Amino acid sequence: MIDANLNRSTEGLRAIEDVLRFGYDDAALSGTARDLRHAFAKAGNLLAPRGLLLLSRDSAGDVGAGRWRSGGRRSAFKDMLFANFRRVQESARVLEESARLSGRPMAARRLQALRYRAYALEKGTWLKLGRR
């Protein structure tokens, strides 16, 4: 669960970063997304070493792999952008609660702060690009 949600959050942020960089040509917002992506990756180390997560990964045996379709159709960069903000925020919540359950309060606080940074980035993005 931790590995899947770390991947989901960093993949979502990569998609956000690329849309902001290549779709909207916005260096400031794409740089903020990049920094947030790196912060999520670093926070993941507070939950479990990356090597341990990789060793425990079982993509072939995952009962949920390939069963669900991705969200609705996306017809514009903006749709892709905000779908990925949801993905990042939801996975951050799962990671935060997993950290609490596993007795890692420092990791939980860090992940909560990252989730709120994702909310702030979404708002800043909407204010700057939402009308385009």
How does the language model describe each region?
Residues 1-6, 11-132:
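Structural preference for solvent-exposed beta-strand-turn elements
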